[in-house]
Amino acid sequence: MAQNFAIYPKKIEEDPQVAEAKKKVEATKPTPEEKQAAAEAEVDALVARAKKALVEFENLDQKQVDRIVAKASIAALNKHLVLAKMAVDETGRGLVEDKATKNIFACEHVTNYLAGQKTVGIIREDDVMGIDEVAEPVGVVAGVTPVTNPTSTAIFKSLIALKTRCPIVFGFHPGAQKCSVEAAKIVRDAAIEAGAPENCIQWIEHPSIQATGALMQHPGVATILATGGPGMVKAAYSSGKPALGVGAGNAPAYVDSDVDIVRAANDLVLSKHFDYGMICATEQAIIAHKDVYDQLIKELKVRKAYFVNAEEKAKLEQYMFGCTAGSGVKPVLNSAVPGKSPQFIAKAAGFEIPADATILAAECKEVSDDEPLTHEKLAPVQAVLKADNKEQAFEMCEKMLKLGAGHTAAIHTNNQELVREYGVRMHACRIIWNQPSSLGGIGDIYNAIAPSLTLGCGSYGGNSVSGNVQAVNLVNIKRIARRNNNMQWFKIPAKTYFEPNAIKYLRDMYGIEKAVIVCDKVMEQLGIVDKIIDQLRARSNRVTFRIIDYVEPEPSVETVEKGAEMMREEFEPDTIIAVGGGSPMDASKIMWLLYEHPEIAFSDVREKFFDIRKRAFKIPPLGKKAKLVCIPTSSGTGSEVTPFAVITDHKTGYKYPITDYALTPSVAIVDPVLARTQPRKLASDAGFDALTHSMEAYVSVYANDFTDGMALHAAKLIWDNLAESVNGEPGLAKTNAQEKMHNAATMAGMAFGSAFLGMCHGMAHTIGALCHIAHGRTNSILLPYVIRYNGQIPEEPTSWPKYNKYIAPERYQDIARNLGIDTGKTPAEAVENLAKAVEDYRDNKLGMNKSFQDCGVDEDYFWSVLDQIGMRAYEDQCTPANPRIPLINDMKDIAVGAYYGVSQAEGHKLRIEREGEAATEEASER
């Protein structure tokens, strides 16, 4: 049997003197621990000096800083060619001429972009908005630079650090230490001569992985400005410091069928050949539409692109990535490739190309690991692919970007819409249109992107920045915010007509051809709808009309949707006329909205807001299809002039006060003749609703000079005329009182339409919906409780800038004085006197119910919904304007007190007792 033998060479005895010398060298070689300690000691010293420079930078103003940057950039510019040659000599990569261009770019374009930028002290003042912005340096910066663009990156980072007064400590790539140090030294020396601190720019003298790691993790370093490959970026982000890191690029370039093919070919070759492809934004694959594919290849060859054959392609792949197409091996770029000439790469791969070849090009079938050349190469080697259509091309580009997420994507086309589609779809932070991607990506030469040699990849590439890194990234912006009073408003219908028989305006109103009259059955029975029809028939033009007469006392979502559907599908009116009490007017507003904007869901408009101008859902302007005319027949709601509409959702049992100025009617007609038929009970309820409107508007946190006069005068008119309008014998006195009440209700509506209301209405909406009590009557029972509640100094007042101190007690004192009620010696006395006067007016002058129990609400039912009362009242849109934040339990106490006709304090005791009993009963059941 044959045997395999291992043949070993004869052992050669080592010279004793050589062996001894080796031992001495090994003995003097530092251990890993010693290397780490030395690196940390060097970094400690550098950072300590940098922190000293940071303090010294504080003494410089903007003018001095700008002079330093200018002098430093000029000094570097003066040596741009020397530095370029040093970089090529040391690294063996790139072209001297192109590196010189990049150095000029760093000195010239970057400095020009920085000129005029404020980075010291107050950098922006906005007297209108009350914001001052103050810039301060982020602190000591750790600068990490690559071997691919060593001198230009060192210059760039030094200049933006100087501009922001940030001392920078560099950890240069060991393969480019000498040229990088020289670049930094030139900038530093010029900066110091111009007045910068001595240690404004420093670097690690003995570069190593340990030293760079120690620098990035040093507690004295504020942020890391990293440029390099994925490993360096990951290390920067893993340091525990804020990092401005970028990563790998794998830019696709799509060449569309509608393109200037000569320009595209020129740009593609120029870009790929520039500095032998070492800018990370350079195209790594050309994906051309089939209609121009052959022509593009022809134009590329005209520009001396060398297209490899199948054998050469395999050799190229093996040399560059250690595998060939279809081998199933994951490609790994040979570190000797980046920045080498096409001739060098071809020869190293095992074939020859012409001496004047500009780039190497290889036709590939797909974008994947099975086509290694579709990966990032940082060399003058280009993959070229054919796409049958736009969609296939886009898919190829997307696959390219998965190998270099977030960096850059290029497109060559004359179709702007296609560019936008491409930009939306590609996960790249720079979309370069009809430009060389390398020079387009760094900005300012071919486009208006900020000039930079550190290009962010956004979240796609695991970066904290998506733009081109600039000086703005090295400053902390502090904002000095002045207290501002929010801009307020006074909005009412464009036209408001009043006086007896004002409905005659309908005869002359412009543009009525097709009208819908929104009302309830009572309006028809009383003949009021006929009066409206008579006015329409008296017009010079013929008006067709429809009547919606099914509005309930508490209009529902279903009702308004039904009415809007009729308007949309059957009639398409140009005018909506709402006549009646608050219910028809409120219903008509939402019908108007859904008629003009059927796409809007009721669930969107009902959401609560704190500032109507900033609400999450904004109702679009109304009036394009129809005008809304509101004609009140009761003297209470004020809906004819407000942006409010109260709608009940029977599915949830909620009564929603919808509010948006788009709902403000186009025209209000306040005709007191129509209110003369109000039943006594309705007149009392409506009158107290209006009184509550005026008082809540006056104490609201949104109250202002424009609404105060309306609110106070409306309250006075109501106080003086409500009883007579309800109880008076038929005659002139009662008629005058009814007219005053009708006007007062509208004035109160104007006041609360801009000042809003408060917790009394928030609770009234809730209790009215749950307990089925008339809205005005609910307000009349709650109002004295709310006056007393708001009349105390609260635990938590409502926050509103203009409301700079709690003045509700003084405001109630104003109301009492205005109504002729004894104000006492203090606001507290005035509050109590006002509350008692309101109770007396309600009980004795109008004979209204004193409590919810008196209204016939079942006791057990009331207690069963008490929690809902508290929660829903807090959620109500009226509640946020209350001067005191109404706590849920406080509102429950008020509700209990109002149910039994006792004080809030007594209501609290009853609630606690009841809840205690319920808890005991629940425990015993368990």
Language-model segment annotations:
Residues Q3-D132, I160, V302:
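N-terminal Rossmann-like NAD(P)+-binding subdomain of aldehyde/semialdehyde dehydrogenases
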Residues K29-P30, A37, I155, V233-S368, ...:
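ALDH superfamily catalytic-core signature
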Residues T31, E58, F351-N486:
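Conserved C-terminal structural/oligomerization subdomain of aldehyde/semialdehyde dehydrogenase
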Residues N112-L114, A183, E558-V673:
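Glycine/threonine-rich beta-strand-loop-alpha-helix active-site module
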Residues L770-S864, P880, Q904, L910-E913:
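Gly/Pro-rich interdomain helix-loop hinge
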